[in-house]
């Protein structure tokens, strides 16, 4: 919101400097982004009148003028502006004047003619937003000889504030003035708005077909309007200083309503509207050429203003080219309405638009403003353009107008939240000055919210308002009033951050990928898994909810490889979305951990090149995570997956249930995706690693450990993990460690057999074991293996 200080001070004029005023506005929560002077630094420029204007004898584009600056004689000034003419009141820089850029005005000759000053344009005075190429044209009653800075009030600044979306009430001079008046305990001096009596009868039928989107619509015909009149300088200057160019009186007045009151308005050429006026949703295949010349193909969720035949405007957004007011317009229809924020939210983005009107309607406009704005605009139109006024025609559905909430504020709640006692009298005063209708109770207040405050709904909103107006800087820094009790955490909980730390310590980097993925890539990886398809996706490449984190991780690998990053180790914790009719919203959300590695195992160094990562590198990293958990029954079972290499993949099992997978990406899929190298991936349900093994104190033996190696022959299909588990079971507490250090298949072994070389560590906490006792433990192990797996010692 951009406005000029002098306009604000017409409404409320606190005895503070510009800097103090800006500080007040910022402390009110309306952050001041910039404060800029209206004009450049200059002096010696006065109001003057062109008494004579003749053609320069030696230059076609120059004129020789006699100018009255209020001095004893007329000044001779040469001017090149096309709009220079006899009788015009102008801004004249006299001899000795200093213009912006330290440009000094001196007597000189131009093509042989004496020039004793300069007739100035806005840009030459450092006034921005001026597109005219001519000199300034002042009103005919401008007093000659008066300093132009004083006459135009150029000792003014433009203030721009950044508003949060909830403070739409401050998108106007009236709204800012209300806030400044509250903090300075002053009254707002708003312009007196009186109803304009009708001088003719010209009723307009209004048909509101979408009352929930537009519960209130007003229209008025004004006939015999002089659209070609010139907007008065005060109106042009108010708009200019707010960053809006003057176009014509009708548009300027509707823009004034928007800036002054916060009520967007629009004017139609009455001859181009065939009553009744309809407020409805767009029909299929309808189009509208907008004021900016673009053609909008209307969607059926768009609210429009229409007549019997055509769409006239996008309601609350932009008017149409066909019904706009132009130089030939004689009669106009003036419109003011309330459009519900939800009816307009997102519509501007559908058409690539953003207008001052839509910016306000999307956030909320005071529903009581339309009538005031209509009368204010009518008064100005009659004053500037003349015309005959018809009655105001109105259609209203009070059922759909915003309700004014009634909020109960408790004294105990106020003290608890703020942590500082504010007197009842002061609390009441603040609420009343904010425009609330307040009733005091023994233990609090009952407050009715004003129509312009859409952001006040609950008790905490009122507390925030009280603290804001009272002043956050006046609230002391006290200790918290709440009694806080530290809540203990279960020792068995394995925090996700602990798992992430293990991965980071192993040189992984955490990534966060979109939950929306390319359905084609996901189908390639998980052809048997149905996915949830979004009805309104961001793009076709992000139209499916992920059923695995694998899709996003592999796309991240490709993204990095395309940027010359060949050694990649990444992981992600996130949700996957599995369609399930029995789940809430028919989607089962599962938290998972996933990772992928590709490239070299280590960065190459002076010891030599590093080898590429393989299946067992990732399996080892995963086993470090599993070692933290209480689930010691987690196992790896060979299994084929569509996305993985058939000979290098496994399911992660817990109590005969599949809880994850690990493996090498299928070469054909890697080729289709354009991924270089051989990525290895895993995905694991987060619930499986949510509990950690609680540490148990064990006695450390002071007696020597005894290592013995055995080599057994078993069927090749028997997993080594089952053999190791059987060893532990047989050796009991005296077998402290079992390690597989070699696997052999080939010569000297029967086909279908394999040899496992296992190291056994035997130790007792109470004594040194004898050879006989050691041999007894080994024999127990061999007997167990022979019984369960028909294992035999290798010769």
Swiss-Prot record:
Catalytic activity, as annotated: tRNA(Phe) + L-phenylalanine + ATP = L-phenylalanyl-tRNA(Phe) + AMP + diphosphate + H(+)
SMART domains referenced in this protein's UniProt entry, alphabetically: B3_4, B5, FDX-ACB
Domain B5: 402-477
GO BP terms, alphabetized: phenylalanyl-tRNA aminoacylation
Main location: cytoplasm
Required cofactor names: Mg(2+)
GO cellular component: phenylalanine-tRNA ligase complex
Superkingdom: Bacteria
GO molecular function annotation: ATP binding; magnesium ion binding; phenylalanine-tRNA ligase activity; tRNA binding
Co-factor note (free text): Binds 2 magnesium ions per tetramer.
Pfam name, any one: tRNA_synthFbeta
Residue intervals of the FDX-ACB domain: 701-794
Family: Belongs to the phenylalanyl-tRNA synthetase beta subunit family. Type 1 subfamily.
Subunit structure: Tetramer of two alpha and two beta subunits.
Name listed for the protein in its UniProt record: Phenylalanine--tRNA ligase beta subunit
Organism: Haemophilus ducreyi (strain 35000HP / ATCC 700724)
Gene this protein is translated from: pheT
């Amino acid at each position: 919101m951009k406005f000029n200080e002098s306009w604000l001070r017409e409404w409320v004029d606190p005895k503070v400097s510009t800097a103090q005023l800006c500080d007040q506005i910022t402390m009110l929560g309306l952050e001041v982004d910039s404060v800029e002077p209206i004009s450049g630094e200059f002096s010696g420029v006065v109001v003057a009148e062109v008494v004579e204007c003749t053609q320069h004898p030696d230059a076609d584009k120059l004129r020789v003028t006699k100018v009255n600056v209020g001095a004893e004689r007329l000044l001779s000034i040469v001017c090149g502006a096309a709009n220079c003419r006899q009788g015009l009141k102008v801004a004249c820089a006299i001899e000795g004047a200093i213009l912006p850029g330290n440009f000094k005005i001196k007597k000189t000759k131009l093509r042989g003619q004496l020039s004793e000053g300069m007739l100035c344009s806005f840009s030459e005075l450092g006034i921005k937003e001026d597109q005219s190429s001519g000199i300034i044209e002042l009103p005919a009653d401008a007093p000659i000889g008066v300093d132009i800075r004083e006459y135009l009030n150029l000792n003014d600044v433009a203030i721009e504030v950044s508003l949060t979306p909830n403070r739409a009430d401050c998108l106007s001079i009236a709204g800012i003035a209300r806030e400044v008046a509250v903090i300075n305990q002053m009254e707002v001096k708003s312009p007196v708005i009186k109803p304009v009596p009708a001088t003719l009868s010209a009723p307009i039928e209004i048909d509101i077909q979408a009352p929930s989107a537009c519960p209130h619509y007003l229209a008025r015909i004004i006939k015999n309007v002089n659209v070609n009149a010139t907007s008065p300088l005060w109106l042009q200057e108010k708009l200019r200083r707010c960053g809006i160019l003057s176009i014509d009186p009708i548009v300027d007045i509707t823009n004034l309503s928007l800036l002054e009151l916060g009520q967007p308005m629009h004017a139609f050429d009455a001859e181009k509207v065939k009553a009744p006026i309809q407020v409805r949703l767009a029909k299929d295949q309808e189009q509208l050429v907008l004021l900016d010349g673009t053609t909008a193909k209307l969607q059926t969720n768009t609210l429009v203003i229409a007549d019997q035949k055509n769409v006239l405007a996008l309601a609350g957004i932009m008017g149409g080219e066909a019904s706009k007011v132009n130089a030939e317009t004689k009669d106009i229809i003036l419109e003011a309405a309330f459009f519900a924020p939800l009816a307009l939210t997102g519509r501007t983005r559908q058409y690539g638009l953003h207008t001052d009107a839509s910016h306000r309607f999307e956030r909320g406009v005071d529903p009581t403003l339309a009538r005031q704005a209509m009368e204010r605009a009518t008064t100005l139109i009659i004053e500037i353009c003349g015309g005959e006024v018809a009655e105001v025609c109105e259609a209203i559905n009070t059922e759909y107008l915003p309700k004014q909430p009634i909020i109960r504020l408790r004294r105990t709640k106020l003290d608890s939240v703020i942590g500082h006692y504010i007197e009842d009298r002061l609390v009441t005063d603040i609420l009343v000055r904010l425009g609330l209708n307040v009733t005091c109770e023994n233990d609090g207040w009952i407050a009715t919210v004003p129509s312009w405050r859409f952001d006040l709904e609950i008790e905490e909103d009122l507390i925030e308002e009280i603290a804001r107006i009272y002043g956050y800087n006046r609230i002391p820094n006290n200790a918290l009033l709440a009694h806080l009790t530290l809540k203990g955490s279960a020792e068995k909980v394995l925090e996700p951050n602990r798992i992430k730390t293990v991965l980071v310590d192993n040189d992984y980097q955490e990534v966060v990928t979109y939950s929306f993925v390319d359905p084609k890539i996901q189908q390639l990886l998980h052809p048997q898994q149905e996915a949830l398809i979004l009805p309104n996706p961001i793009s076709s490449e992000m139209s499916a909810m992920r059923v695995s984190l694998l899709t996003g991780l592999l796309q991240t690998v490709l993204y990095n490889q395309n940027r010359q990053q060949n050694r990649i180790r990444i992981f992600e914790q996130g949700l996957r979305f599995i369609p399930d009719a029995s789940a809430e919203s028919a989607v089962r959300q599962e938290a998972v951990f996933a990772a992928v590695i590709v490239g070299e195992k280590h960065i190459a160094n002076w010891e030599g090149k590093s080898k590429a990562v393989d299946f067992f590198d990732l399996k080892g990293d995963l086993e470090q995570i599993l070692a933290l958990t209480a689930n010691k029954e987690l196992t790896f079972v060979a299994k084929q997956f569509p996305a993985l290499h058939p000979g290098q993949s496994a399911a992660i099992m817990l109590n005969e249930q599949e809880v994850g997978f690990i493996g090498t990406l299928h070469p054909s899929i890697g080729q289709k995706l354009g991924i270089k190298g051989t990525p290895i991936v895993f995905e694991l349900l987060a619930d499986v690693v949510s509990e950690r093994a609680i540490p148990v104190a064990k006695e450390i033996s002071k007696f020597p450990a005894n290592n013995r190696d055995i080599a057994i022959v078993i069927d090749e299909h028997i997993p080594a993990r089952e053999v190791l588990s059987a060893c532990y079971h047989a050796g009991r507490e005296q077998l402290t460690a079992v390690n597989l250090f070699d696997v052999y298949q080939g010569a000297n072994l029967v086909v279908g057999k394999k040899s496992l070389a296992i190291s056994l560590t035997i130790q007792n906490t109470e004594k040194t074991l004898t050879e006989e006792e050691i041999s007894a433990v080994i024999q127990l192990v061999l007997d167990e293996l022979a019984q369960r797996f028909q294992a035999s010692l290798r010769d």
